[in-house]
Amino acid sequence: MSTKNKKAAGGNGGAPKQTRQQSHDSQDYSSFKTVLFYCMLIVFLPVLTFFVLKGFVLDQFLDISEVKVNIASAVGAVVALHVALGLYIYRAYFGAPGSKASKTD
């Protein structure tokens, strides 16, 4: 029997390995999307919070000085940053539902 026939007679020897690789790739992609989402949230949420508070909320509706508006907007941005970090840490610590690591041999 030649090596060509042995490979043909062997069946799907590579199929479980390929399926396992696709499963790992899917998990890696899911992890990448999660980390990218939280990175963007941590970067953009405080910036958006600062400018929304400064431009639309505090300047429009409250009659306070410019310095106090900037300080209040900065405090709001710091609070938003802590909320985003807290969400990331909570997700990293407790994990997503169904994301338990399973060992396969």
UniProtKB/Swiss-Prot annotation:
Function field: Required for the assembly of the V0 complex of the vacuolar ATPase (V-ATPase) in the endoplasmic reticulum.
Pfam family, one: VMA21
Topology with respect to the bilayer: Multi-pass membrane protein
Family: Belongs to the VMA21 family.
Example of a GO cellular component annotation carried by this entry: endoplasmic reticulum-Golgi intermediate compartment membrane
Transmembrane segments: 37-57, 69-89
Organism lineage: Eukaryota, Metazoa, Ecdysozoa, Arthropoda, Hexapoda
PANTHER family from the UniProt entry: VACUOLAR ATPASE ASSEMBLY INTEGRAL MEMBRANE PROTEIN VMA21, VACUOLAR ATPASE ASSEMBLY INTEGRAL MEMBRANE PROTEIN VMA21 HOMOLOG
Tagged with keyword Endoplasmic reticulum: yes
Record topology, Lumenal segments: 58-68
Segments of this protein annotated with the region Disordered: 1-26
GO biological process: vacuolar proton-transporting V-type ATPase complex assembly
Segments in the Cytoplasmic topological domain: 1-36, 90-105
Organism name: Drosophila yakuba
Keyword Membrane on entry: yes
Sorted UniProt keywords: Cytoplasmic vesicle, Endoplasmic reticulum, Membrane, Transmembrane, Transmembrane helix
Annotated protein name in UniProt: Vacuolar ATPase assembly integral membrane protein VMA21 homolog
Cell location: Endoplasmic reticulum membrane; Endoplasmic reticulum-Golgi intermediate compartment membrane; Cytoplasmic vesicle, COPII-coated vesicle membrane
Domain of life of the native organism: Eukaryota
